[in-house]
C-alpha cells in the first residue's frame, strides 16, 4: 500500500511571511532559474490540452470523497477557516533559509549552510533536545556531538523512521550503522511504527487514506524555548547539497 506521510506545517503571518516571500523571489530571480517553457519545447495542440484537462478533472472528482479530504473537512483548522476565527499562538519567529549562492559555492563553504545559522542554538542547549528527522544520518561527528550533549546533562531524544516506515531504505542504512553508538552515548532513539496509520486521535485518524505511515516532519525543540520547523534533515546531503 501507499505510504501516508506524517508531516508538519506551520502558518505564519506578519514579517515572517514577507521573509519567506523574499527567499522565494531570490530563487525565482536567480541566474540558475529558467522558465518551464525552456523544457516544454513546442506548445501542445488543443487536443492534447483537452485530454490533459479531462484527466485532471477526473482525478479531482475521484478525490472528492476521499478519506483524506473528509479528514480535512472535519479538522479544527477547517472549521476555524470557515468561521473566520483562526486561533494563533503568538510568539517571536524568524525565517532562516539557504541562499541560492550555495548551489554555486564549494561544498565546504559551511558559512553558506543553514546549519551554521542553527549552530548557536544547539551550542546553547542546557536541558533538552527533541529532534524529528525522517532522514537522519548523523555520521561519526554527529554521534560525538550528541554524546557530548548528553555528557553535559542534556536529555537528547531523536525520532526517525524505522526500516519498515522509511521510503528511502538507503538513507536508513546510513542511520542504522550509528544506532548502537548513539544508544551507548545515552541518546534516546524512537523509530516510526508504520502501523500507526490505524490509530485514532480526537475522533479523527492521524493518517488517512493509507494503512501504512511514514515520518516526514522535520523539527527540533530546544530546551522547550525554541522550535525549528522546516525542510532540513540532519543528514549530509540536506546540509551540504540541498537548499533548505
Language-model-derived ranges and their functions:
Residues 1-244:
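Charged, low-complexity intrinsically disordered terminal segments
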Amino acid at each position: 500500500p501507499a505510504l501516508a506521510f506524517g508531516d508538519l506545517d506551520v502558518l505564519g503571518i506578519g514579517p515572517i511571511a514577507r521573509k519567506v516571500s523574499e527567499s522565494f523571489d531570490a530563487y525565482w530571480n536567480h541566474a540558475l532559474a529558467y522558465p518551464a517553457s525552456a523544457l516544454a519545447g513546442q506548445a501542445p495542440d488543443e487536443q492534447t490540452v483537452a485530454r490533459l484537462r479531462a484527466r485532471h478533472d477526473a482525478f479531482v472528482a475521484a478525490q472528492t470523497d476521499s478519506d483524506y479530504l473528509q479528514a480535512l473537512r472535519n479538522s479544527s483548522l477547517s472549521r476555524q477557516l470557515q468561521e473566520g476565527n483562526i486561533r494563533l499562538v503568538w510568539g517571536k519567529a524568524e525565517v532562516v533559509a539557504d541562499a541560492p549562492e550555495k548551489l554555486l559555492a564549494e561544498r565546504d563553504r559551511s558559512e553558506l549552510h543553514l546549519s551554521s545559522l542553527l549552530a548557536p542554538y544547539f551550542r546553547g542547549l542546557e536541558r533538552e533536545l527533541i529532534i524529528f528527522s525522517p532522514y537522519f544520518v548523523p555520521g561519526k561527528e554527529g554521534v560525538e556531538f550528541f554524546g557530548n550533549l548528553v555528557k553535559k546533562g542534556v536529555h537528547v531524544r531523536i525520532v526517525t523512521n524505522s526500516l519498515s516506515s522509511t521510503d528511502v531504505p538507503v538513507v536508513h542504512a546510513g542511520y542504522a550503522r550509528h544506532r548502537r553508538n548513539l544508544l551507548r552515548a545515552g541518546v534516546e532513539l524512537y523509530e516510526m511504527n508504520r502501523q500507526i496509520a490505524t490509530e485514532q486521535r480526537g475522533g479523527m485518524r492521524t493518517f488517512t487514506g493509507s494503512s501504512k505511515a511514514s515520518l516526514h516532519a522535520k523539527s527540533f525543540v530546544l530546551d522547550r524555548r525554541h522550535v525549528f520547523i522546516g525542510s532540513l534533515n540532519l543528514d549530509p546531503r540536506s546540509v551540504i547539497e540541498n537548499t533548505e
